[in-house]
Amino acid sequence: MERVYRTDLKLLRYFLAVAEELHFGRAAARLNMSQPPLSIHIKELENQLGTQLFIRHSRSVVLTHAGKILMEESRRLLVNANNVLARIEQIGRGEAGRIELGVVGTAMWGRMRPVMRRFLRENPNVDVLFREKMPAMQMALLERRELDAGIWRMATEPPTGFTSLRLHESAFLVAMPEEHHLSSFSTVPLEALRDEYFVTMPPVYTDWDFLQRVCQQVGFSPVVIREVNEPQTVLAMVSMGIGITLIADSYAQMNWPGVIFRPLKQRIPADLYIVYETQQVTPAMVKLLAALTQ
């Protein structure tokens, strides 16, 4: 079994002062302590390690080979320890840390992009890890505390112990080819899409499970003719006349050639929410929440 040493950092600081000064009196003055206790501490360290660190003369000391090695390693260890403690202080102030953030793909369009860009620029020591997951998976990861927060378009309230905050209001639009027979409508009834073919993305990237339920509430299940991974590919296929899609209004900013966007007559909210465990908010998360909700 590997030996566990009980030497604390204070003993190493005492040793390093003597090793650098090569004189107990000067080292004691540097440490603002008297010489006898310093000599006792150095002897204690030598006893713990079972080796002599200094050769003592009447007016000076010389490092042994073991002492020279310990001096090099002690400098490195104390610098590392100081860096670790400084980082923990930064984490406590929200100036550093890591945030595991679940997102649906559609969340990264619209207002969130400039907000996140500014947050990352202003907090360079906060590492935000984006994990693209469908809402149900995000909620499961939140409950297992594998995510700090999740962002999706809410259809239900979160479980007890979790908080949801609306980041901004949004709505779903119909994206269709510009020559589509519904393009003359200023608003499109959802039931008018009953016989249309849909192009969409997998649930991990989008809100399609929610949209399917909304369509079923007005009496039809949408027919998916193509499923692709990127919103740009969805809109490219819409522009080719392959099908239509329901998409958050933030995508209308993309201004795709050959694609027109129309609001639905029955507004389907696409409001974006952030969900997190109420009692597990780190200082870095507090800063992120402030940035996202200001």
Swiss-Prot record:
Question: Has keyword Transcription regulation?
Answer: yes
Q: Which UniProt keywords apply?
A: Activator, DNA-binding, Transcription, Transcription regulation
Q: Where is the HTH lysR-type domain?
A: 7-64
The record's section on Gene3D superfamilies has: Periplasmic binding protein-like II, Winged helix-like DNA-binding domain superfamily/Winged helix DNA-binding domain
The cross-references to PANTHER family, in alphabetical order and at most eight, read: HTH-TYPE TRANSCRIPTIONAL REGULATOR XAPR, TRANSCRIPTIONAL DUAL REGULATOR HCAR-RELATED
List where this protein forms a coiled coil. none
Annotated GO biological process: positive regulation of DNA-templated transcription; regulation of DNA-templated transcription
Lineage of producing organism: Bacteria, Pseudomonadati, Pseudomonadota, Gammaproteobacteria, Enterobacterales
- What molecular function terms (GO) are annotated for this protein? DNA binding; DNA-binding transcription factor activity
Q: Name one Pfam family in it.
A: LysR_substrate
Function of the protein: Positive regulator required for the expression of xapA and xapB. Binds to the inducer xanthosine.
The source's superkingdom equals: Bacteria
User: May I have one GO cellular component term?
Assistant: protein-DNA complex
Question: Is Cell inner membrane one of the keywords UniProt gives this record?
Answer: no
Q: What is this protein called?
A: HTH-type transcriptional regulator XapR
